[in-house]
Amino acid sequence: SAPQSIWYGPDRPKNRELEVIHSRFGEAVWFK
């Protein structure tokens, strides 16, 4: 799994669908 700082830091994606995906899977599962 990717470092959480990537997803929770300043560069965290603001796309709500991606946030839902993250909360459901508990992992950074999207592609950049």
Curated annotation (Swiss-Prot):
Residues reported to bind chlorophyll a 2: 22
Cofactor note: Binds at least 14 chlorophylls (8 Chl-a and 6 Chl-b) and carotenoids such as lutein and neoxanthin.
Compartments, record wording: Plastid, Chloroplast thylakoid membrane
Mod. after translation: Photoregulated by reversible phosphorylation of its threonine residues.
Keywords attached to this entry: Chlorophyll, Chloroplast, Chromophore, Magnesium, Membrane, Metal-binding, Phosphoprotein, Photosynthesis, Photosystem I, Photosystem II, Plastid, Thylakoid, Transmembrane
Molecular-function annotations in GO: chlorophyll binding; metal ion binding
Assembly with partners or alone: The LHC complex consists of chlorophyll a-b binding proteins.
Record family assignment: Belongs to the light-harvesting chlorophyll a/b-binding (LHC) protein family.
Protein name per UniProt: Chlorophyll a-b binding protein 2, chloroplastic
